[in-house]
Amino acid sequence: MRITNTLTGKKEEFVPIQPGVVRMYVCGPTVYDLIHVGNARPALVFDVFRRYLEYRGYRVIMVQNFTDIDDKIINKANQLGVDYKTVADTFIAEYWRDAHALGIRPANFHPRTTDFVEDIVEIIEKLVEKGFAYQTETGVYFDVRKFEKYGELSKKKIEDLIAGARVEVDETKKSPLDFSLWKKAKPGEPCWKSPWGEGRPGWHIECTVMSVKILGESFDIHAGGEDLVFPHHENEKAQAEALTGKVFARYWMHNGMVRFLGDKMSKSTGNIFTVREAVKRYGRDGLRYMILSKHYRSPMDFSEELLQDYSRAVKRVWEILGRYEKSGDIGIPKRNAVYEEYVNRFVEALDDDFNTPVAVSLIFELARNLSKAMDDNDREDALLYYHLIRREFGPVLGLFDLNEEKKEVSSEELLKLLIEVRDVLRKEKRYDLSDRIRDRLREIGIILKDTPSGTEYTVE
């Protein structure tokens, strides 16, 4: 298996530190709003990568964090008139709802920043003791000039970064590139006690601490979006290696950005399309297919028109699978030469820098073969193709997966549809049918009320 390592810029043979075990850390969301398709891409891509590692026989220990204290969370809390924890708890719950809807499996660990504050303080103290960090009146900062390998991951030179620095000016810092480890509290902000006064952790230190505490001082894979390479991942690496003197992560994997309306999809610009809306309109497999049909390192253009096309393609495969399932011939095929050839092609694709576009195309090829085999009444081949889609490759890619439920229509959607039908019947003066719908709904505890602005309902 070969993957592109951002650290070296090369496609390298993947060899884990401990044979048979892969330890990986994926940067998770800052929880202050619903996740959009751009947020979902790394979560989905690296979940599928984890599934593939498991398919290849590895035991995977995966960590994905939640940043549950941050300026954006504090601003959202102030805007809503609630405390920061309410915002974080709410949007972590909403994240799980969307992740489940998209078929993203939980990692082994989902640490929250606020659960690791004591550990963060302890590690900042060690960095200060080692001379890599210093205190000012605004907090504690990492001294980038003290870490000789700073810029190694992002291929940036300190001198060039300082010359082009657009960092917020803080005259208490030794260099504009020095980044915050501990922020002194502002009035009214959530804070924790520390040797440097009350405050809260900086963004970069939290991921370093959580990954080291859970996975160890050195682990196999650190992953996330390419927009995190600098400064976030560069700073994580600097902190960890200054602390331990060891290689932090051996392989760095980064997915390309999602572009929407010509620009990077981003909450800060309002240029977003939420996962919830995408799944609701076009189904889980349509969005999964769209994301996996692009190589993870390439940028991905998003539009509703494109998503609609992917959704239609997925529906055609579901129709072929449904047609086969009606035959009732759901057995286990012989593992013959054709079976082995497809497995080899699948593994060859994903072993080559996780080439999901090729792997996904195999499923659609198999679907065409399945359709033809059914037309030819070739039951043996049909079973083989069906098995490969639903039981062999589907669970790895999370597409057409027997282990996942098909998209369900919610009871609320069905109720709204019934109300729409009833409104049409009333306009056509077909009161016998409209009243029958109203009365049957009342029997199951749903009370309709006709108003000038439309029909409202309550549930008893």
UniProtKB/Swiss-Prot annotation:
Main location, first listed in the record: cytoplasm
E.C. number: 6.1.1.16
Compartment(s): Cytoplasm
Database matches in CDD domains: CysRS_core
Motif annotated as 'KMSKS' region, chain positions: 264-268
Cross-referenced SMART domains: DALR_2 (SM00840)
Superkingdom to which the source organism belongs: Bacteria
Binding positions for Zn(2+) per the UniProt entry: 27, 207, 232, 236
UniProt GO BP: cysteinyl-tRNA aminoacylation
InterPro entries, sorted: Cys-tRNA-ligase, Cys-tRNA-synt_Ia_DALR, Cys-tRNA/MSH_ligase, Rossmann-like_a/b/a_fold, tRNA-synt_1_cat_dom, tRNAsynth_Ia_anticodon-bd
Class in the EC hierarchy, top level: ligase
GO cellular component: a single term: cytoplasm
UniProt cofactor note: Binds 1 zinc ion per subunit.
Cofactor entry: Zn(2+)
Gene Ontology molecular-function annotations: ATP binding; cysteine-tRNA ligase activity; zinc ion binding
Binding, ATP: 267
UniProt keywords, alphabetically: Aminoacyl-tRNA synthetase, ATP-binding, Cytoplasm, Ligase, Metal-binding, Nucleotide-binding, Protein biosynthesis, Zinc
Substrates-to-products reaction catalysed: tRNA(Cys) + L-cysteine + ATP = L-cysteinyl-tRNA(Cys) + AMP + diphosphate
Motif 'HIGH' region, residue range(s) on this chain: 29-39
Family as reported in the entry's similarity comment: Belongs to the class-I aminoacyl-tRNA synthetase family.
HAMAP family in the record: Cys_tRNA_synth
Subunit structure: Monomer.
Protein name per the record: Cysteine--tRNA ligase
Gene: cysS
